[in-house]
């Protein structure tokens, strides 16, 4: 706990039950992994403060099914280079800050398996540029719910790339929720010769809270949505040929 100071972390292994780190900036390089060492407390990871990816980073509580919480912004050291992998089993994942809002991160996977819920405050900002450069995979067919509680979710292809954005949750019910206001999900090409990522909401119906209009756009990438429902009279705009 460094309060307003900076904290630098490399690997933390499986002989730790809980990890809680607080700092003005938390620099992470490597894997933080918890173990199920307590009968009363599922091993979790809490990062309180802004996080910088100094290398490829994995946060893993899969063996303990513990929660993963990151309260601040998450940025890469070099745009589109450092990757992020999250695995929490049945534990909840919550990103309270914007991902890639200042410096875009690389390929990102959040819960390729497990039923844990996922909450994301934002990917990028109002600028028309991808905040995750590469492949983005959020959830899987067992994910109990995904909540987008911000307004901007913007990904991008690297120059010459053909990466994808895939959001997946259980196919039962309206389990992909937009709750933070009028939201935009968008993808952008890396240059004039590169289309934006294909965007796929593969399973799980999108639910739009009252007055939470939704815009989905791409620079030519295909867009596929399994289903959308609104709570009142929300507006949905889908455009796959924005340039």
In which residue ranges do the predicted regions lie?
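Extracellular lectin-like interaction modules
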Residues: 1-243
């Amino acid at each position: 706990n460094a309060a307003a100071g900076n904290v630098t972390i490399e690997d933390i292994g499986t002989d730790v039950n809980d990890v809680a780190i607080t700092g003005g900036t938390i620099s992470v390089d490597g894997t933080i992994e918890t173990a199920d060492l307590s009968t009363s407390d599922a091993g979790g990871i809490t990062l309180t403060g802004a996080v910088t990816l100094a290398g490829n980073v994995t946060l893993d509580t899969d063996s303990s099914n513990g929660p993963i919480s990151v309260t601040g912004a998450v940025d890469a050291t070099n745009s589109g280079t450092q990757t992020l992998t999250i695995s929490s089993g049945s534990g909840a994942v919550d990103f309270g800050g914007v991902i890639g809002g200042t410096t875009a991160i690389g390929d990102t996977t959040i819960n390729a398996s497990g039923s844990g819920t996922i909450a994301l405050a934002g990917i990028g900002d109002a600028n028309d540029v991808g905040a995750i450069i590469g492949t983005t995979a959020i959830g899987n067919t067992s994910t109990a719910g995904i909540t987008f509680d911000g307004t901007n979710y913007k990904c991008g292809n690297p120059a010459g790339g053909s990466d994808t954005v895939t959001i997946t949750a259980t196919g039962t019910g309206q389990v992909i929720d937009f709750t933070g206001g009028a939201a935009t999900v968008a993808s952008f090409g890396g240059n004039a010769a590169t289309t934006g990522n294909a965007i796929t909401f593969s399973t799980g119906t999108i639910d739009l809270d009252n007055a939470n209009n939704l815009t989905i756009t791409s620079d030519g990438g295909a867009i596929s949505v399994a289903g959308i429902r609104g709570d009142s009279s929300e507006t949905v705009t889908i455009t796959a040929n924005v340039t």
